């Protein structure tokens, strides 16, 4: 089934070229189908890149999905024109009375700041609280995962000495869990972060299940037992060249950066990197969407009861 997006969203043509099935809003309105309504809070600087990465994965589902994009109103975007945000994005004030089957909150390159120093922290806290009664399942990615764990459970992030940067091997910890169904026992996934969460703090919270972790970089995937909150500390949505673009950006700016671990063939940054995590990314999003479809109330207003 297709994803339903705004008719003239710029990434639409790229998705169509890749074979992603897209349906325009005008056509979807004439279909007697209850789609899954998913809101994406995009905190990344390069909005279109993140849109493309997430829509590609959501579009692999057999379930029709209607997607809306949200941006924080208390932050002035530096890399995206206001006209683009006004046309394709909404604000929290505009949607806070609506209900959604799922919410995705992306990462953000602001790990050097304490959460309270982030200029949109209070707005994000409001969104976290709102999601308890207006969203069935929230998927938090990288920085958003750390922010959500801090807000909901009081777990603080910790700075690491060297950036966790590359493609690492992970092990599935809970067999036959609905989110990791079909995963191989071990799999690869990329990370790009300067902070971590102490695993002892996660294991001390009975409400949380750690589903996948790495001996090298710690926990990758965890979720509350009711699947209302899901956390990914890495970036399985990344494209093959995303880590390369980050690496070259920092290298060309003379910033301290190592070659991404286990990314380039033979660790040679003149060679073309391969996407070795694509399968697990598609499978995870397929599993998550399937669980949302199975468990979300048909009448989303029941979430507020």
Predicted regions and their residues:
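Amide-donor transfer/coupling interface in amidating biosynthetic enzymes
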Residues: 1-74, 89-90, 95, 99, ...
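Short, glycine/acidic-enriched capping/hinge loops at junctions between secondary-structure elements
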Residues: 50-53, 79-82, 115-116
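N-terminal beta-loop-helix "entrance" segment that forms/cooperates
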Residues: 73-86
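Helical hinge/lid and interdomain linker segments adjacent to catalytic or ligand-binding clefts
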Residues: 85, 89-92, 108, 115
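Cysteine-nucleophile active-site neighborhood
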Residues: 105-174
């Amino acid at each position: 089934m297709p994803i339903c997006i705004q008719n003239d969203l710029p990434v639409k043509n790229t998705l169509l070229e890749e074979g992603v099935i897209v349906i325009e809003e005008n056509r979807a309105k004439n279909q007697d189908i209850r789609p899954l309504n998913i809101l994406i809070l995009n905190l990344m600087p390069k909005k279109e890149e993140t849109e493309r990465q997430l829509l590609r994965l959501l579009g692999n589902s057999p379930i029709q999905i209607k997607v809306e994009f949200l941006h924080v109103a208390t932050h002035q975007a530096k890399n995206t024109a206001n006209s683009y945000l006004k046309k394709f994005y909404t604000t929290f004030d505009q949607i806070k009375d609506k209900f959604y089957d799922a919410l995705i909150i992306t990462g953000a390159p602001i790990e050097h700041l304490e959460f309270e120093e982030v200029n949109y922290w209070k707005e994000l806290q409001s969104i976290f609280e709102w999601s308890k009664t207006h969203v069935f399942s929230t998927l938090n990615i990288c920085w958003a995962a750390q922010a959500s764990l801090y807000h909901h459970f009081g777990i603080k992030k910790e700075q690491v000495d060297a950036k966790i940067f590359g493609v690492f091997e992970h092990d599935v910890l809970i067999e036959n869990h609905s989110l990791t169904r079909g995963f191989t026992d071990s799999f690869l996934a990329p990370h790009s972060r300067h902070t971590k969460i102490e695993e002892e703090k996660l294991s001390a919270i009975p409400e949380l299940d750690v589903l996948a972790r790495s001996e090298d970089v710690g926990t990758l995937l965890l979720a509350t037992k009711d699947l209302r909150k899901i956390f990914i500390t890495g970036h399985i949505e990344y494209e093959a060249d995303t880590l390369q673009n980050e690496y070259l950006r920092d290298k060309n700016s003379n910033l301290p950066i190592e070659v991404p671990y286990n990314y380039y063939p033979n660790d040679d940054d003149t060679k073309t990197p391969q996407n070795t995590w694509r399968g697990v990314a598609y499978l995870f999003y397929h599993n998550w969407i399937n669980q949302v479809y199975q468990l979300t109330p048909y009448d989303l207003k029941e979430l507020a009861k």
